[in-house]
């Protein structure tokens, strides 16, 4: 039995490295059912679960990672808390996202300025944006920009510029589109961690969709596709790719309704539990396609 577990762990880790999310997730799930995974394996398991569209399970696993990190590294625990807040926010749970942001803040109080403070500032900014709190959004955005400059951190600089661009577009300033173009095209800079880069893309695409800026939806969806190809080479299916495809299809007007239904139905499972906005768009696309097919 020990040999079987060892072999399954090897399969899970190897599959993850080659971006075979399904095999990795299923193998980790089998091992997790019979033995305790170490913290690094748990984190990878959570990531594979998210990419397979299992958002609720991914959050549950990452909460275990957070609990373990509390005992060993408060700064890493704070970073994990911020990631959890971002995940809950993507899934449409603003109150829980705020709760995790506050946990992260408590862990970072008194800690010398580090990148984790910047990611937390981003989380506070986007939760404020989703809550319609302009004052807190502005404060958190300025804080992020200051930390990015102080640390000379390229990833945080990209996040700060993305927030500035989305804020400008939302306020009706067309210069915001140019700022976002500079951040996102041809592709978002590689130093930005996957979870945070994905949030930038989903926010920019959702904003362009709300503004009926179909040219930007197409351009930024192409950028996200290139980003997926760079971060998930050889992977043909993942939640991130599905979110990208949902936005891409939302800007297509000449697709056969029946073909569109087939494509959207295949995407529904992957986005339903990881991105509330994309999940809503899936239902809109299905409703529109069914109506056109009649």
Language-model-derived ranges and their functions:
Residues 11-17, 40-55, 78-94, 116-133, ...:
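Tandem amphipathic alpha-helical repeat scaffolds
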Residues 25-33, 63-70, 102-112, 141-153, ...:
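Amphipathic alpha-helical segments of tetratricopeptide repeats
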């Amino acid at each position: 039995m020990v040999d079987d577990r060892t072999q399954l762990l090897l399969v899970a880790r190897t599959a993850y490295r080659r971006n075979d999310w399904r095999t990795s997730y299923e193998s980790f799930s089998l091992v997790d059912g019979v033995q305790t995974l170490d913290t690094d394996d748990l984190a990878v398991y959570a990531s594979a679960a998210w990419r397979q569209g299992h958002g609720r399970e991914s959050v549950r696993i990452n909460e275990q990672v957070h609990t373990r990190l509390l005992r060993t590294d408060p700064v890493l625990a704070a970073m994990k808390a911020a990631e959890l807040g971002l995940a809950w926010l993507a899934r449409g749970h603003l109150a829980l996202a705020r709760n995790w942001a506050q946990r992260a803040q408590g862990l970072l109080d008194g800690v010398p300025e580090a990148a984790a403070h910047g990611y937390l500032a981003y989380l506070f900014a986007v939760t404020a944006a989703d809550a319609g709190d302009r004052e807190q959004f502005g404060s958190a955005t300025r804080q992020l920009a200051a930390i990015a400059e102080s640390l000379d951190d390229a990833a945080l600089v990209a996040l700060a510029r993305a927030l500035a661009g989305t804020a400008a577009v939302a306020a009706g300033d067309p210069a915001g589109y140019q700022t976002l173009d500079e951040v996102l095209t041809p592709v978002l800079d590689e130093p930005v961690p996957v979870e945070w880069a994905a949030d930038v893309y989903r926010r920019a695409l959702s904003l362009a969709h709300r503004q009926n800026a179909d040219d930007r939806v197409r351009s930024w969806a192409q950028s996200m596709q290139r980003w997926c190809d760079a971060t998930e080479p050889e992977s043909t299916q993942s939640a991130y790719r599905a979110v990208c495809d949902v936005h891409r299809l939302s800007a297509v007007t000449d697709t056969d309704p029946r073909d569109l239904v087939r494509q959207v139905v295949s995407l529904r499972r992957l986005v339903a539990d990881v991105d509330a906005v994309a999940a809503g768009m899936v239902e809109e696309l299905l409703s529109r396609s069914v109506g056109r097919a009649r």
